[in-house]
A protein has these predicted regions:
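Long, compositionally biased
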Residues: 135-159
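Proteins synthesized as precursors that undergo proteolytic processing into mature forms
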Residues: 92-128, 240-248
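Short, surface-exposed beta-strand-loop junctions and turns on beta-sheet-rich folds
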Residues: 20-22, 81-83, 156-159, 166, ...
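Short hydrophobic/aromatic-rich beta-strand segments that constitute the beta-sheet cores
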Residues: 75-77, 160, 284-286
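A contiguous strand-loop segment
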Residues: 1-94, 126, 311-315, 319-324
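C-terminus-biased signal that marks the final domain/tail of proteins
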Residues: 1-13, 118, 127-130, 135-136, ...
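Broad, structure-driven detector of short, well-ordered beta-strand segments within folded domains
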Residues: 28, 68, 149-153, 275
Length: 324
């Protein structure tokens, strides 16, 4: 269970929460321009755009959860259990394994328009990374500063949706998530007027009553509505610090606390990490469940012409600033 969002001020910001009951040793990974990408069916890409994001590195391969490239295109895969459907290879298609999809797009595409063109030819296959690592059931959000789409590989084929809110969670399929927003069209950040009856003197006895009815539970549909409302109504100064701070506030609205979402006896889904990438500057910010201080990695401070992955372990401990 996860939530992804976009935000734009002077720069463009993209990030997500990773909500799960256990970690797989995620790291902040930079894939430099000359790191060789060997695809199962699509040959080798020796030189490509540099990419930064969160990944689990296995056999020197970055299994990205979310990432952005040096051109400002960003992408994340979110759980889509029960609805995702991957196929065997299809003649005449670009047969890309599920775990290769993020590198396939971000290594070659500078914007969403180019990604759309590449996706027209794609078949996302069920080829596993290894027998011990089955293909994740995912759908994807792809965004730049001007456009945002959602890609779903389902039984009917590849579906590409425009995403005007710049938010994605999990089930149900994206078109159903968007339709659900119609049920909340009356919500507002402003105080409500009395439309119940002009014969009753009803008053707004508390601030925030314009958003009464905004879902507060942790289900994916409710998180979509809540994140969309918060994102669409967010306001901040346009500078970097204010924008990054506001982005984390947006995703903190769907934060999951240990104990509130039990997935098995004694096991709870939590927000393992929250990310925010300034895709214009190539700076990847993040927090973790036990590390609320914002940490950052700047891809442009590394040798982007290298052929080796660069990885930074996530800071997972709390850092408390004592003032006396």
């Amino acid at each position: 269970m996860c939530t992804a969002a976009t935000y734009k001020t002077n720069d463009f910001y993209f990030g997500r929460t990773l909500d799960y009951e256990s970690s797989y040793g995620e790291e902040i990974v930079i894939m430099p321009r000359n790191f060789p990408l060997n695809f199962v069916n699509m040959g080798r890409i020796a030189t490509h755009y540099a990419v930064i994001g969160t990944a689990h590195v296995a056999q020197d391969y970055p299994l990205f959860y979310d990432a952005a490239n040096e051109k400002g295109l960003a992408m994340a895969g979110l759980n889509f259990v029960g609805n995702s459907f991957y196929r065997d290879d299809i003649d005449g298609k670009d047969n890309v394994a599920q775990f290769e999809f993020i590198p396939w797009i971000l290594s070659q595409c500078a914007n969403v328009t180019e990604a759309r063109t590449l996706i027209e030819k794609i078949n996302i296959t069920k080829t596993q990374f290894s027998p011990q690592m089955p293909s994740g059931q995912l759908h994807w959000i792809i965004a730049d500063k001007n456009d945002c789409i959602v890609v779903e590989s389902v039984k009917e084929g590849i579906k590409v949706y425009n995403d005007p809110v710049g938010v994605l969670t999990n089930n149900p399929p994206f078109d159903m998530q968007m339709f659900r927003l119609n049920d909340f069209r009356g919500l507002s950040p402003k105080q409500p007027e009395n439309t119940f009856s002009d014969k009753l003197d009803l008053t707004s006895y508390s601030r925030g009553m314009g958003a009464m009815g905004l879902p507060g539970d942790l289900s994916s549909q409710s998180r979509f509505v809540r994140a969309a409302f918060v994102k669409m109504n967010s306001r901040s100064a346009p500078d970097e610090q204010s924008s990054v701070s506001q982005f984390f506030h947006i995703l903190n609205s769907v934060d999951q606390q240990r104990g509130c979402c039990e997935v098995a006896e004694g096991k709870y889904e939590i927000t393992i990490y929250t990310s925010c990438c300034n895709t214009d500057k190539g700076i990847y910010y993040y927090t973790t469940y036990n590390g609320h201080q914002i940490s950052a990695v700047d891809m442009h401070k590394e040798d982007l012409y290298s052929a080796k992955l660069i990885a930074y372990p996530m800071i997972t401990g709390e850092i408390i600033n004592f003032q006396n």
